[in-house]
Amino acid sequence: MGSSNLVVIVQKEAAEGLRRQLRLAGILDPNRKIGMRGAHVLIPVSRHPGDLSGFEAEVTEDDRLEERSARSTPFELIVDAAAIEPGLKRFLPDKWEMIGDVLVLKLPPELGGCKVAVAEAYARVLGARAVLQDLAGIEGEWRVPRVEKIWGGSTETVHLADGIRFMLDPARVMFSSGNLPERMRMARISRPGETVVDMFAGIGYFAIPMAVHSRPRSIIACEVNPVAFHYLEENARINRVENITPLLGDCRDTAPEGVADRIVMGYLRAQGFLDKAMKVAGPQAVLHYHEACPNELIDTRPWSSLREAASRAGRRIELLRLHRLKSYAPGVSHIVIDARLS
């Protein structure tokens, strides 16, 4: 008996239990669909399953079962759609970031001469309205992304994450969709009655989800970049939150002192702002401090910076949590520390 057309015939009532057993045994044939013949179900198998007396089933051959159509992955469709030299297709990136309907791509230099055609292929398959080339990271305290638009129209978009709508222009302001787990954690970490100070609010990455899901008494959101500040205000409006007070300017000048029950420092080069954070903290406060740190210094440098800042301010500090979020660059990680000040 050949193996390519093997099926197991079983009564309808026993079919689902048998199908599960065959799948667990690795015998279920994924290339053919299950069929019906009157009161019986025909389950395709890749080899003889052995004794099936417990199911009152029999094994036979049947070449009439419909084959499953092969499903191409989005990347396979992109490779097929790209109108470039066949020899260049091996350089197409298999990873990308979708921010709303704007696509952000990192392209190797080999694709520099055909990047418009490449962008069009990705956009057509993924449904993007515009494509940005990531030219490596962000710049300065304003956290301006280094990108170039290579295809499409307007880059302003609305990105949905964890039930929150973020309006932004990823060509002008930073956004990382890969930080969703940390945003989800922070969204629910505050307590009713708290005053939260977000020293680097951006477009509201942490402040807006926290306002929606945790509902603290007040969130004071500081942002130095006027473009990001515009979107911070817009995101408070479109998500209908009223407990956020946006403040435009350097947080060292704008953040009120002695008021915070919780402080968020989401800027990865915030060491120079720690003295201000100590002044912003109320008598008891929790600090969430982010840093881009060389891997060999993760266990020492960030916590040492916090302890030294607390000592200068005459404060006590307790480490609650140190967590590596993701790789930031070769040999460098994005970490976050939760600490309690008293």
PLM region descriptions:
Residues 1-342:
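SAM-dependent transferase fold signal centered on methyltransferase-like domains
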